[in-house]
Design a protein with these regions (language model features):
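Glycine-rich phosphate/diphosphate-binding loops that line cofactor/substrate pockets in enzymes
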Residues: 65-81, 221-228, 295
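Phosphate-binding and adjacent anionic-ligand microenvironments
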Residues: 300, 337-520, 526-547
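Gly/Ser/Thr-enriched, mixed-charge loops and adjacent short helices
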Residues: 2-38, 134-135, 152-294
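Proline/glycine-rich low-complexity loops and linkers
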Residues: 112-117, 176-207, 315-391, 396-399
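Short glycine-rich or small-residue beta-strand-to-loop segments that form or flank ligand, phosphate
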Residues: 50-51, 80-86, 231-234, 314, ...
């Protein structure tokens, strides 16, 4: 995909959304239930869409919230329902709609007091704290967020009582019922006016923020960061964590400069992403251009996306740290710095993450759990302590408390940012330097991800390939040692293909939102070998789809 001439530059006025137009479209546009693009569709992070495309409108949220209430009843979930939102313009609208439906269904609602924002990890933690030691009246929740997606988008993400992203059984149930309701015009959905919902006996306000902040000492060595006197910076990218960082400063005596405290639903302060869109992606050097420009003023800087489940780490030596590099550093450090963690607890990684992680885990004598893409696969293990760290190459991760018990079962960009500061404080090396030291022991892998065009039919075939569809016996001059369509760690379908050789691998997966597929590839040799891997990967995928 060609790089936009606007990439990395301040967003021009022409790119800014009109929040009033979004609100009108949200309430007045009626989706077409016969159009798949306008139906409720749960991906790896809930239902997403835009009022402007007829894919995230009031009708969708009425249907989804009602379906969720019915799912709770079917599953015997009778405890409180925690609901939070990020800073996207549509999020507050969808949250209000959901409150009207939840209250009408008699669900016990718990919402952040003072109409404040709620990061995904704070909500996950709140669910787990409520459910600790309980066997009945278990809590669940929703975060209204499209994550780092553009300002015109909305999202609705369900977290069951395990606190993590819902599994496909739950999302499939809710999606099917929501679309039934959508087709019938939501006639069977229950709903009361917002004012009545907020006066109802089952509506409660609670502070999620300070309990989360005060509990951080049990997952991060905050005293080490304070004692080191590190000069730190954070850019919340206008997201839900924006009002968490000053309390973290004051509670722990840290020196974190919140360089951009603005909240603006147009996200006019952002620099433009690679494709010419505004996107609050903390892993993109283009979206992170403003913070990168400040890298030499601080010993370490970091950012989160709008629901704070992702992280971006900026160091003076490397600039924006490659997500795979930081995952490797975090895992290596934690396996040496958390002696109370169970020795048999696994490190969870998705199969498109770097194989450098495999080598670090093997050298530590620990178990690797390689899963399909999606943080939901790590949630059960994080909950019971059988997984001590779970991470995705898309900059989402979480890990256990220092005592080896659960912290969150959803991604937590705040603790990954603070972990970078802990690593710097306790080792004297910022994460960029730490990674390059690791390469002297484990080698220097070369990794890339590219997009390739695909029709909807080709995407569907790619998602259902069998290993037999790959006829090639070699890749980039080496014998193929594995052809995978199911993940080694849990034998779940990967929704694509992974091909492995001694010194390289590639994986191909269809995009969930665009007519393209993604190729991930890594070489243990050099960039030329990587280029050959990618070229042959495209040939193998094309031949497999034809067959």
């Amino acid at each position: 995909m060609a790089l936009s001439p606007l990439a990395g530059k301040p967003a021009p006025k022409e790119l800014l959304i009109d929040p009033a137009q979004l609100e009108r479209e949200y309430y007045t546009r009626a989706p077409d239930p016969s159009d798949p693009a306008q139906q409720v569709s749960f991906g790896t992070s809930g239902h997403r869409g835009s009022p402007l495309r007829g894919s995230f409108n009031e009708a969708h949220i009425v249907a989804t919230a009602q379906a969720m209430c019915e799912y709770r009843q079917a599953q015997g979930i009778t405890g409180p329902h925690f609901i939070g939102r990020d800073t996207h313009a549509v999020s507050i609208l969808a949250q209000r709609t959901a409150l009207e439906v939840l209250a009408a269904n008699g669900v016990e609602i718990v919402i952040q007091s003072d109409d404040e924002f709620t990061p995904t990890p704070a909500l996950s933690r709140a669910i787990l704290v409520h459910n600790r030691g309980r066997t009945d009246r278990l809590a669940d929740g929703v975060v209204v967020t499209p994550s780092h997606n553009p300002p015109e988008d909305g999202g609705f993400k369900y977290n069951p009582p395990n606190g993590g992203p819902a599994d496909t059984d739950a999302t499939g149930w809710i999606q099917r019922r929501a679309n039934e309701l959508l087709r019938e015009g939501n006639r069977s959905a229950k709903r009361i006016p917002l004012a009545a919902a907020q006066r109802a006996a089952n509506y409660h306000e609670q502070d999620f923020r300070m309990p989360y902040v005060q509990d951080l000492r049990h997952v991060i060595d905050m005293e080490a960061i304070r004692a080191a006197g590190l000069k730190l910076a954070v850019d919340p990218l206008g997201g839900a964590a924006v009002h968490y960082w000053e309390p973290i400063n004051s509670v722990y005596g840290l020196d974190i400069d919140v360089v951009n405290p603005r909240v603006d639903p147009t996200f006019a302060f952002m620099t433009v992403d690679h494709d010419g869109k505004i996107r609050m992606d903390s892993s993109s050097p283009y979206a992170m251009a403003s913070l990168l420009g400040l890298k030499d003023r601080f010993q370490l800087a970091f950012a989160n996306d709008t629901d704070a489940d992702r992280h971006g780490i900026v160091t003076p030596s490397t600039g924006l740290l490659n997500p795979n590099h930081y995952l490797t550093v975090a895992i290596h450090y934690l396996l040496n710095a958390r002696p109370q963690w169970r020795r048999d607890a696994a490190i969870g990684k998705t199969l498109v993450s770097s194989s450098m992680i495999d080598r670090v885990v093997a050298a530590a004598g620990r178990r690797l759990l390689e899963t399909p893409v999606g943080f939901k696969w790590f949630a059960p293990g994080l909950l019971d302590g059988s997984v001590c760290f779970g991470g995705e190459e898309s900059t989402g991760a979480s890990f256990l408390r220092q005592d080896g018990t659960v912290w969150t079962t959803d991604k937590d960009g705040i603790i990954l940012a603070l972990l970078a500061a802990e690593i710097t404080a306790r080792t004297g090396k910022e994460p960029g330097q730490y990674y390059w030291d690791l390469t002297t022991q484990f080698g220097t892998p070369h990794y890339t991800r590219i997009d390739a065009p695909a029709t909807p039919e080709q995407k569907a075939r790619l998602g259902k390939l069998s290993p037999d569809a790959v006829r090639a016996s070699s890749l980039a001059g080496e014998p193929i040692t594995a052809k995978l369509t199911r993940a080694p760690g849990n034998d779940q379908p990967i929704g694509g293909l992974k091909v492995v050789t001694e010194n390289g691998w590639f994986a191909a997966r269809p995009s969930g939102t665009e007519n393209l597929y993604k190729i991930y590839a890594e070489s243990q040799r050099d960039t030329r070998h990587l280029q050959t891997l990618v070229a042959e990967a495209q040939q193998i995928v094309a031949e497999s789809l034809r067959s």
